[in-house]
Amino acid sequence: MAKLPQVPFGAVYFRKSNPPQQDWERDYKTAAEDGLNVFRHWFMWSAIERAPGKFDWDDYDRQLDLAAKHGIVTIIAELSQTTPDWAVRKFADARQVLYDGRVHPSIQSPSSATGGFSHSGGGTGTLTLNAPEVRAAAQNFLTTMARRYKGHPALLGYDVWNECNYSPYTDYGPYTVAAFRDWLKRKYGTLDDLARAWHRYSYAEWDDIEPPTQFMPYCECLDWLRFKQDNHYEQMQFRIDAIRAADPDAMIVAHGTAGSVTQLAQRGSDDWRAASKVETYGYTWVSARKGTEPWKNFFAADLVRGAARGKSFWHAERQGGPLWMQPQVLGRDKDDGRVATPEDIRLWSLSSFAGGARGMMNLRFRPLLDGPLFGAFGSYDMAGHRTPRSDMAASIARWANAQKQADLMKAAPVTGDIGIIMAPEAQGFAFLLNYNGKFDTYSAAMWGAYRGFFDNNIQADWVHIDDIEGRNILYFPYPIMLLPDQAEKITNWVRAGGVLICEACPGYFGPGGRAGTKQPN
């Protein structure tokens, strides 16, 4: 088992279709010479189990052996959501279904010219893990993989969810619908209790219940969103358990998109929940997609530091090169993160370290050679040669891992001057309330508060509503919905001496999305 470096600093490297095999040895040598000490690779089920029970590990074995040779540690990103084509045929009844009845096809990814992906987002594939046969097949893949690489001198651990998210529009297939009904039984107990909560009075059997296909601020929609979160985080735990059963010593990591403020309700991007399940958490933050305003350089690290609740966290995907031909860059100046410079890489890296990140990976060691993201993000050039950008990254890697920086890298940011409350229920209800109008009220309020403090040199921490004890001053943006226990928690905190600065309409809506007949609710 490999040892964790002082500061894991490296890149995502192997995705089966890229980079070319003839360059692997040279690339590893270059990376090691430049001070890079960690690679993450995509171990795609669809590329490895080529027929039932017939695994092709050759290319993956080579990655770990090269890593051991050159002193680089390896994070295996398990991509069990990339479904083998034979499994799509064999388990056709388990294909995920969109809200309009269309089934998910098996496609190639924009980030890998390899089959088995789906349109359904970062955490789910063509088939649902709610189907027992699919889950058993995925578990067999995970178990076989973990047993194979257990104890390898280059193995550091496993990334069990890439960019923790899923599609807002799935899954309406029979296995997930059945799981939803079971979830409702556990929550409500009887059909009568569910009928009162949902205002649907003609359910004769549990099988009459179908998940909602609209996004509206009603109890059934809130329940559907919550079920999907519970369901996918249970699937995350399933992957963790499968790997740990085969290799208890492997490090377990995951990374999201710092998306709790913008994507929690619809895509399940709950950084707090994801971080709670792993030893080290991380985040993807690409300035070419997000923008390079000063406050944005710190936002993701600050949010994930709060979500990590004291655990180590990494900037797991940091931009190292240009981006073009993508919707996020339209209408933006090329200097707005689109064409990364060495100085950009220095700024982005040091901002993340200042925010508390203690590991860093470029999301490409070198650019892809095919697909819509060809040529994007790599610090090294299309052939894997050094560039001024890679030289800058190398200098940061060496600096961060120098012995004289050991104490610095053990340090952490001080507690902020003020905490910004993150309330998942408020975010979820705001998403449903504003969906048809296409308003981004919640994220605008949260970002506005953070930016206001940042621009006035006030350090603001992100604080989950469950974590307010121990804070002195809190700011609560757009607190439109609260559960009774949350309202009681905040009330007791204020009575105990806490200072709360609260925007309008705190808890205006309560359980089930129902407005109070008097306010404050």
Please provide the spans of the model-predicted regions.
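An acidic-aromatic substrate-binding cleft motif
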Residues: 1-24, 28-38
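Short, well-ordered coil/turn segments that N-cap beta-strands
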Residues: 4-9, 35-37, 68-74, 151-156, ...
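The substrate-binding groove and active-site-proximal loops of carbohydrate-active enzymes
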Residues: 9-20, 42-58, 118-139, 163-169, ...
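Short, acidic/polar
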Residues: 18-33, 138-144, 262-275, 340-351, ...
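Catalytic domains of carbohydrate-active enzymes, especially glycoside hydrolases
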Residues: 23-44, 59-66, 70-81, 276-281, ...
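Aromatic-lined substrate-binding rim segments of carbohydrate-active enzymes
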Residues: 24-112, 116, 135-149, 233-247, ...
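Polysaccharide-binding and catalytic clefts of secreted carbohydrate-active enzymes
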Residues: 100-297
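Carbohydrate-binding surfaces of carbohydrate-active enzymes
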Residues: 290-299, 303-521
